[in-house]
């Protein structure tokens, strides 16, 4: 089989390594897990869902994807707005998305509030009750693109920096997202807070264990996946991140391939033909090397039509590399000079509001930073924001008020003469459910996880709501 046939063949696969069969459905601009401030359907029958004593009133469909549907809903008692993602549950498998979501607690990751099962026509569905976030980076970027304006640099920096934090956090837990794209980056435009969503393709990668290569949305798919690698690492998320950064700067996808082979062609047009050594680094089992010799296109030329900061071009050149091991790590990306403006205490949003929380690093994040990077990543004015006890700064002590409550998003710290060294059990806690800083939303403290024995009832009301 030729190299072209090998790549095209992967576009025909219909199952993922969850064992789920992929189906083709109409996908909204916000994808299966993103949210919208307004439901997309003009008419929607309100449905009342009761689970574990909590009553949800669905308001409308806000997203459709290959694995399910997302509806906007209201918690009847509290009037809190949530998003409910409903996916078909294959009873032969545990739902990996639910198990992974239970592990996560980070300000830049959409939070899981509850989960329950429903049945319909002899099929079982898993319902994930998620934090509601009104917009996506995709829609914001498209708004600027349609207005023929670039996304302001301050927003590009904020979005990518927060995305790096979320990726660094999940990677510290061994989790690979495997579907980083603008549609999966939820955004609260009032605060510019970004939250990574849709962990339907996510997986804990184990060295020596094979994984499917047909994963990740095409325009953001790392070249090792196109070359059929089944032993890839979390660096595929870093490639996707670089593609998102380039897209925000260009106003369009950097590699707009129409199929597997065309995607590789688009990458080669920019990076040049990969060498045998680079192909071996991507997939040591790939044997066909029949590619036309094309020289790399210098990055400044790729962005020549745009007013793009030199630091951003330098950053992209260190991310979008064929050799996965040569790409910057997410935490190294955060420390890049491109983001120095965010570390300036005088920097604020264009409307004068303060920046969203950027330095409240969880213990899990800190274990991946290291003392050298910490000096760059955590400015002196933000030392009171990191989670304690800090493996980076053991001399920082938790005040008595914060010891009694772990719900504060910013730890109140003070200098202490008595050194508090982080114990091995503390620094290794990232391998289990992390003790991290919760999202600022008051509703976060109500987060619960239901069991498979949930009693759930569903009622469809006769009232039709117009949106």
UniProtKB/Swiss-Prot annotation:
EC number: 2.7.11.26
Ranges in a coiled coil: none
Role of this protein: During cellular differentiation, may mediate an extracellular cyclic AMP stimulated signal transduction pathway that regulates prespore and prestalk B-cell proportions through inhibition of stalk cell formation and induction of prespore cell differentiation. The cAMP receptor carC appears to activate gskA via the tyrosine kinases zakA and zak2, to stimulate prespore differentiation, while carD appears to negatively regulate gskA, to promote prestalk formation.
Phenotype reported upon loss of the gene: Cells grow normally in both axenic medium and with bacteria. Under starvation conditions, mutants lacking gskA aggregate more quickly and form smaller mounds than wild type, fail to form slugs and take longer than wild type to reach culmination. At culmination, mutants lacking gskA form abnormal fruiting bodies characterized by an unusually large mound-like basal disk. Prestalk B (pstB) cells are formed at the expense of prespore cells, and the proportion of gskA null cells that differentiate into spores is greatly reduced when compared to wild-type cells.
Family designation: Belongs to the protein kinase superfamily. CMGC Ser/Thr protein kinase family. GSK-3 subfamily.
Keyword field contains Coiled coil: no
Compositionally biased spans, kind Low complexity: 23-37
Signal peptide location: none
Catalytic activity: L-seryl-[tau protein] + ATP = O-phospho-L-seryl-[tau protein] + ADP + H(+); L-threonyl-[tau protein] + ATP = O-phospho-L-threonyl-[tau protein] + ADP + H(+)
GO molecular function terms attached to this record: ATP binding; GTPase regulator activity; protein kinase activity; protein serine kinase activity; protein serine/threonine kinase activity
Listed SUPFAM superfamilies: Protein kinase-like (PK-like)
Protein kinase domain span: 56-339
Residue stretches of biased makeup (Basic and acidic residues): 1-20
Protein's recorded name: Glycogen synthase kinase-3
Entry-linked SMART domains: S_TKc
GO terms under biological process: adenylate cyclase-activating G protein-coupled cAMP receptor signaling pathway; aggregation involved in sorocarp development; cell differentiation; chemotaxis to cAMP; chemotaxis to folate; culmination involved in sorocarp development; intracellular signal transduction; mitotic cytokinesis
Cofactor field: Mg(2+)
Gene Ontology cellular component terms for the protein in this record: centrosome; cytoplasm; mitotic spindle; nucleus
Ranges for region Disordered: 1-42, 400-467
Segments passing through the bilayer: none
Chain positions found as Phosphotyrosine: 214, 220
UniProt-annotated catalytic positions: 179 (proton acceptor)
Gene: gskA
Binding sites annotated in the UniProt record for ATP: 62-70, 85
Activity regulation note: Inhibited by lithium. Lithium inhibition is competitive with respect to magnesium but non-competitive with respect to the peptide substrate.
């Amino acid at each position: 089989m030729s190299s072209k046939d090998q790549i095209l063949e992967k576009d025909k696969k219909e199952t993922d390594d969850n064992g789920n069969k992929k189906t083709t459905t109409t996908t909204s601009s916000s994808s299966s897990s993103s949210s919208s401030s307004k439901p997309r359907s003009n008419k929607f029958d309100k449905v009342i869902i009761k689970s574990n004593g909590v009553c949800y009133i669905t308001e409308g469909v806000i997203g459709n994807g290959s694995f399910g549907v997302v509806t906007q809903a209201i918690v009847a008692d509290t009037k809190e707005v949530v998003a409910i993602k409903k996916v078909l549950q294959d009873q032969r498998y545990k739902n990996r998305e639910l198990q992974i979501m239970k592990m996560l607690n980070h300000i830049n990751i959409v939070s899981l509030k509850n989960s329950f099962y429903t049945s319909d026509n002899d099929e079982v569905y898993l319902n994930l009750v998620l934090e509601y976030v009104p917009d996506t980076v995709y829609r914001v970027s498209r708004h600027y693109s349609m207005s023929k304006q670039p996304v302001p640099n301050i927003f590009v920096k904020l979005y990518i920096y927060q995305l790096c934090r979320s990726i660094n956090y999940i990677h510290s837990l061994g989790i690979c997202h495997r579907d980083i794209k603008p549609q999966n980056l939820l955004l609260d435009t009032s605060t510019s807070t970004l939250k990574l969503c849709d962990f339907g393709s996510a997986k804990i990668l184990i060295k020596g264990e094979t994984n499917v290569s047909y994963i990740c949305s095409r325009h953001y798919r790392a070249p090792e996946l196109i070359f059929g690698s089944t032993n890839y690492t979390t660096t595929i998320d870093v490639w996707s991140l670089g593609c998102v950064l380039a897209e925000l700067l260009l106003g369009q996808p950097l590699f707009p391939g129409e199929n597997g082979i065309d995607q590789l062609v688009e990458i080669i047009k920019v990076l040049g033909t990969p060498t045998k050594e680079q192909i071996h680094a991507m997939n040591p089992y790939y044997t066909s090397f029949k590619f036309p010799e094309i020289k790399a296109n210098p990055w400044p030329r790729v962005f020549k039509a745009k007013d793009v900061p030199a630091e951003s071009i330098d950053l992209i050149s260190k991310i979008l590399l064929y050799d996965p091991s040569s790409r910057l790590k997410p935490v190294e990306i955060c420390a890049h000079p491109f983001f120095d403006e965010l570390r300036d205490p005088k920097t604020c949003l264009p409307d004068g509001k303060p920046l969203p929380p950027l330095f409240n690093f969880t213990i899990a994040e800190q274990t991946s930073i290291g003392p050298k990077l910490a000096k760059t990543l955590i400015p002196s004015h933000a030392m009171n924001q990191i989670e304690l006890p800090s493996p980076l700064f053991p001399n920082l002590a938790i005040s008595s008020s914060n010891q009694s409550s772990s719900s504060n998003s910013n730890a109140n710290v003070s200098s202490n003469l008595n050194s508090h060294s982080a114990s091995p059990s503390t620094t290794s806690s990232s391998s289990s459910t992390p003790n991290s800083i919760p999202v600022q939303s008051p509703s976060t403290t109500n987060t619960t996880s239901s069991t498979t024995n949930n009693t759930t009832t569903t009622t469809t009301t006769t009232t039709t709501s117009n949106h």
